[in-house]
Design a protein with these regions (language model features):
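Rossmann-fold NAD(P)-binding glycine/threonine-rich loop
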Residues: 129-197
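N-terminal Rossmann-like dinucleotide-binding module
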Residues: 43-73
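Long, compositionally biased stretches enriched for glycine and/or charged residues
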Residues: 222-500
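NAD(P)-binding Rossmann-fold cofactor-contacting core
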Residues: 68-89
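Short acidic low-complexity segments
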Residues: 102-115
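Short, positively charged and aromatic/hydrophobic N-terminal segments
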Residues: 6-12, 26-27, 32
Length: 500
């Protein structure tokens, strides 16, 4: 296997001639509000800071910055067009939430990462167009193209892992020696496995699905989130939940008997009988794609657009609309435009794949948005981790981390999605002494797929790439796997090089 510093990644970008085209080197080197900071600073850098979800990210960071000791936030993106729209809106929202917090926008990755204490990665190689290509390619073979599982997850890994390898190597050189990296980039668990395999032990995988489900179940019980705990085990987007407790008292029976469990939570995607057959362990919502795969594929095919095509169309409309607004001088109009289109995205979440009814998300003004209670999301998980490390106060959260003996069925180095106890020393996965055969069989198979995918990318092995997709439960076909690899490797050879 290649060492990190031996991996050579060539990626094509449309940018000015004569500019370093490595994504971790930035495109234009532009920087906004980059005045010198004096005194003690704690710097958090967001790679992919021009993403559409950035305003939610900066709100959470701004509100939690003081408790976490963060004084400076840098939003970096390789796309100046996105950064100076969504990143600028995010910066202005963050400044309104916390005027004392220093924000900066830049397309220069080295400047963004220099002396960083914490890094959040939320990138999307090949943008929305890549997602559309991945989905349609998979569907043309009759298999699911969802971007975090199966063929779609494999394709996204091809364009995510090489970029993040470059960023991690740059961070190792220029960031603080004890820098922590929170990977939000999908497929989060697989990407985290690839980075940990290469020796980037400062990387933790984060997904907001478990924390979102935790919030739903606490609301179902009518208790504060701080009083409610549960255990998560499995892989990212392939996990189950058990050990439900309020103030230490087991409430599993109450949850299973709750009349609204299958209406008010993500359990609405599953049949109660399936949960009973599964031993009454509650599944992550993405297990819908495994247990109802044919239904998901047929629902997508019967729709006029895939999820990726829907997102691409909405984002293109939003991008054009924001071109007509002076964001610096009319944040209210810019934010209204942003939220109007963002609501369209969220209202369609999981509806194309399941055939379910769309959501109905309101469009708040910027001031209403700032006043609304913060949901935390991805940033909330990262900030809670930072605070626990700083104070030594023990808390629990779900992360993708090396198994390290927590689950005896898997190797110590296997990255798994587990409930961890966080303290001043770091993350400690809680033991999972026994996994029922029904779940264990699926986890083992998908973990083998993940490890083979990582090896295929790092070793540039065509054989391992085909093997990985052949054994994946959502493909399970050698001819289809081979055809998918042939198509994806050609599209993404600018990221992974030539597979042989």
């Amino acid at each position: 296997m290649n060492r990190p510093d031996e991996i050579r990644i060539k990626i094509k970008f449309v940018c000015r001639e004569g500019v370093d085209r490595r994504p971790w080197a930035g495109i234009m080197g532009e920087e906004e509000n980059g005045r010198e900071r004096k005194g003690s600073t704690m710097k958090l850098t967001v790679l992919g800071g021009g993403g559409v979800r950035s305003p939610f990210l900066t709100k959470s960071i701004a509100l939690g910055a003081q408790a976490a000791g963060i004084t400076e936030v840098v939003l970096m993106d390789s796309s100046a067009a996105k950064l100076y729209k969504y990143g600028k809106i995010a910066k202005l929202v963050g400044e309104r939430c916390n005027p004392a917090l220093h924000f900066m926008l830049t397309t220069d990755a080295e400047e963004a990462l220099r002396d960083a204490d914490y890094i959040i990665t939320t990138i999307r190689g090949d943008a929305d167009e890549g997602r559309v290509f991945d989905e349609r390619t998979a569907l043309s073979h009759g298999v699911l193209g969802q971007e975090t599982t199966g063929a779609g997850g494999f394709a996204m890994a091809l364009r995510s892992i090489p970029i993040l390898t470059g960023y991690c190597e740059l961070a190792r050189r220029v960031a603080k020696p004890n820098v922590l990296i929170f990977n939000f980039t999908n497929p989060s668990g697989l990407v985290t496995q690839a980075l940990r395999t290469q020796g980037y032990d400062m990387v933790y995988g984060v997904c907001d699905a478990p924390s979102g489900f935790h919030k739903q179940l606490a609301a179902l019980l009518g208790v504060e989130r701080e009083r409610f705990t549960m255990r998560c085990w499995g892989l990212n987007h392939l996990s189950w939940f058990d050990s439900f407790r309020v103030d230490g008292e087991d409430v599993t029976g109450k949850i299973l008997a709750a009349p609204r469990l299958y209406q008010d939570t993500e359990m609405k995607h599953f049949d109660p009988e399936l949960v009973r057959l599964s031993g009454n362990f509650l599944p992550n919502e993405y297990l819908y794609f495994y247990y109802y795969s044919n239904r998901a594929v047929q629902s997508i095919l019967s729709s006029s657009k895939t999820r990726g095509e829907t997102i691409l169309e909405i984002n293109q409309k939003m991008h054009r609309a924001l071109d007509e607004i002076d964001i610096d001088h009319d944040l209210e109009a810019a934010f209204h435009c942003f939220m109007l289109h963002y609501a369209m995205r969220e209202n369609s979440y999981f509806t194309i794949e399941t055939g379910g009814a769309p959501k109905n998300i309101d469009v708040p003004t910027v001031e209403e948005f700032i006043r609304q209670p913060d949901g935390g999301g991805y940033a909330g998980v990262a900030l809670d981790f930072i605070k626990a490390r700083a104070t030594g106060e023990k808390i629990q959260m779900v992360l993708s981390v090396p198994n390290n003996g927590a689950c005896p069925y898997f190797a110590d180095g296997d990255v798994m999605e587990l409930t961890c106890e966080i303290d001043g020393e770091g993350a400690h996965p809680l033991p999972v002494p026994e996994i029922p055969p029904m779940q264990l069989n699926l986890i083992r198979t998908v973990k083998l797929y993940e490890n083979l995918t990582v090896e295929a990318i790092l070793e540039k092995s065509y054989e391992k790439a085909v093997k990985a997709l052949t054994i994946h439960p959502l493909i399970n076909s050698y001819p289809i796997a081979k055809s998918l690899v042939d198509t994806y490797k050609e599209r993404y050879k600018g990221y992974i090089g030539e597979l042989s």
